[in-house]
Curated annotation (Swiss-Prot):
<comment type="similarity">
    <text>Belongs to the acetyltransferase family. OlsB subfamily.</text>
</comment>
<keyword id="KW-0444">Lipid biosynthesis</keyword>
<keyword id="KW-0443">Lipid metabolism</keyword>
<keyword id="KW-0808">Transferase</keyword>
<dbReference type="Pfam" id="PF13444">
    <property type="entry name" value="Acetyltransf_5"/>
</dbReference>
<protein>
    <recommendedName>
        <fullName>L-ornithine N(alpha)-acyltransferase</fullName>
        <ecNumber>2.3.2.30</ecNumber>
    </recommendedName>
</protein>
<comment type="function">
    <text>Catalyzes the first step in the biosynthesis of ornithine lipids, which are phosphorus-free membrane lipids. Catalyzes the 3-hydroxyacyl-acyl carrier protein-dependent acylation of ornithine to form lyso-ornithine lipid (LOL).</text>
</comment>
<dbReference type="InterPro" id="IPR052351">
    <property type="entry name" value="Ornithine_N-alpha-AT"/>
</dbReference>
<dbReference type="InterPro" id="IPR016181">
    <property type="entry name" value="Acyl_CoA_acyltransferase"/>
</dbReference>
<dbReference type="GO" id="GO:0043810">
    <property type="term" value="F:ornithine-acyl [acyl carrier protein] N-acyltransferase activity"/>
</dbReference>
<comment type="pathway">
    <text>Lipid metabolism.</text>
</comment>
<dbReference type="GO" id="GO:0006629">
    <property type="term" value="P:lipid metabolic process"/>
</dbReference>
<keyword id="KW-0012">Acyltransferase</keyword>
Length: 259
């Protein structure tokens, strides 16, 4: 896996304990910080879990200064599912929110990304870049051609999100042949293109979404309002074969240390 600073280790989770540690981080971010809910959330043990966890690879960034039994040692995480594995399971997580027929029909190697999170104490540094580095290794190892997954705006007040949603629709809509559509369709073109406020749109855009856009990413058609999780979701896609050399260099840029 990718290199990381000396106090960190980054790898795929090796056992149930490391998956539980990623679930502890997800609880801190998605439940305590963002107010999400779900049927399998364990409030007593502070774990955010669902039925998909045993089926996915879990990419985890570990604070190596903490003991192995400490569930707070995972400080950043991603959840990954390849299309060959999804074919065995019968579905992706995103199937509940978006019609993925165009992606499946493409015949290309897919990777679903989800549950991306970074502990508040580790934001603004190298943690997200470390995840991207390790993700790049995974993509190359499995010859992935398209990455996709839902990314979230905090809250379900679509009117308050009309500028960033409309900006995504007008400037970053995926090619029609690769464009998933939201099942419970929420229009994103809530502001006419000529009435967009670029600064307001980008200021309201989550950093993860902006990172995908910098790498040449696209969005699907329509948003999905996830009331139990207290988010408004958009579908992000990235075609690794269509990435420019500039984007590819950013995506695979290394950070010094060990992994």
């Amino acid at each position: 896996m990718a290199a990381a600073p000396l106090s960190y280790e980054i790898r795929l989770a090796r056992d149930a304990q490391e998956i539980r540690a990623s679930q502890r981080l997800r609880y801190a971010v998605f439940v305590e910080e963002l107010g999400g809910a779900g049927p399998l959330i364990d409030h007593e043990n502070r774990l955010e879990a669902d039925e998909f966890d045993p089926l996915y690879d879990h990419l985890v960034l570990i604070d190596a200064t903490k003991p192995e039994e400490d569930l707070d040692r995972v400080v950043a995480a991603y959840r990954l599912l390849r299309s060959d594995r999804a074919a065995e399971i019968g579905r992706f997580y995103c199937d509940a929110e978006y019609d993925l027929t165009p992606l499946r029909a493409s015949g290309r190697r897919l990777l679903e990304l989800g549950r991306s999170c970074v502990h508040p104490d580790h934001r603004g540094g190298a943690a997200m870049l470390m995840l991207w580095n390790a993700l790049a290794d995974y993509v190359l190892a499995h010859e992935i051609e398209i990455l996709f997954g839902v990314a979230s705006f905090h809250g379900t007040d679509v009117a308050a999100l009309q500028q960033p949603l409309a900006w995504l629709h007008h400037h970053h809509l995926a090619p029609e042949g690769l464009r998933p559509r939201a099942r419970q369709f929420q229009r994103m073109d809530l502001v006419a293109k000529e009435a967009l406020d670029r600064r307001a749109a980008l200021d309201a855009m989550p950093n993860l979404i902006k990172a995908y856009l910098r790498l040449g990413g696209f969005v699907g058609e329509g948003a999905f309002v996830d009331r139990p999780f207290n988010t408004t979701d958009v579908m992000l896609l990235m075609d690794t074969q269509a990435m420019s050399e500039k984007h590819r260099e950013f995506y695979t840029r290394r950070v010094e240390g060990r992994g």
